[in-house]
């Protein structure tokens, strides 16, 4: 599978958000990555659906919506209404992950799952064949500009092996 570049708009300057989206539109990026944080699952708040609607109007690339929130399943209809191609939820935020993945797929989006640096890749064994993509966090979620956590490279290798073994 060809790697897909999905630049995040988390650090965008909101005064120039349209310019940043236009830059992504003109790039080789495959998607626009949007991080949504609720201040509960992670200790920070990003932006909400009014900003996402604005981004969706401007973006020519598919939206990759990464929910760092509790109960992400409650927002499946809103994420779908934005026209998102991918809805990415955290393993750690979903006690019924398989159900959430099914709901995302039934809504017509590609389900993706994220794991935090401390979460073992083996936790994805039962769900790996049901998701389009896995995001391995290389920092603890909630803040930009953190130092890269070295052992996450090993997690990517473990994930590749899990995908190879399970098909």
Regions found by a protein language model. Give the residues of each.
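Conserved N-terminal beta1-alpha1 strand-loop-helix module at the mouth
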Residues: 1-88, 94-96, 103-106, 110-111, ...
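Short acidic loop-to-helix transition motifs that present clustered carboxylates
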Residues: 118-120
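Short glycine-rich anion-binding loops that position phosphate/pyrophosphate groups of nucleotides
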Residues: 139-141
């Amino acid at each position: 599978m060809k790697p897909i570049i999905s630049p995040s708009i988390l650090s965008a300057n909101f005064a120039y958000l349209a310019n940043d989206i236009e830059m992504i539109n003109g790039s080789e990026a495959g998607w626009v990555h949007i991080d949504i944080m609720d201040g509960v699952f992670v200790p920070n708040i990003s932006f909400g659906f009014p900003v996402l609607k604005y981004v969706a109007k401007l973006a020519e690339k598919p939206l990759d919506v990464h929910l760092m929130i509790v109960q992400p399943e409650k927002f499946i209809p809103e994420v779908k209404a934005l026209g998102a191609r991918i809805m990415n939820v955290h393993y750690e935020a979903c006690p019924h992950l398989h159900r959430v993945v099914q709901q995302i797929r039934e809504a017509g989006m590609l389900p993706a799952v994220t794991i935090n640096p401390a979460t073992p890749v083996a936790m994805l064994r039962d769900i790996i064949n049901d998701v389009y993509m896995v995001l391995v966090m290389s920092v603890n979620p909630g803040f930009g500009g953190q130092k890269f956590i070295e052992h996450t490279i090993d997690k990517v290798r473990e994930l590749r092996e899990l995908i190879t073994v399970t098909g």
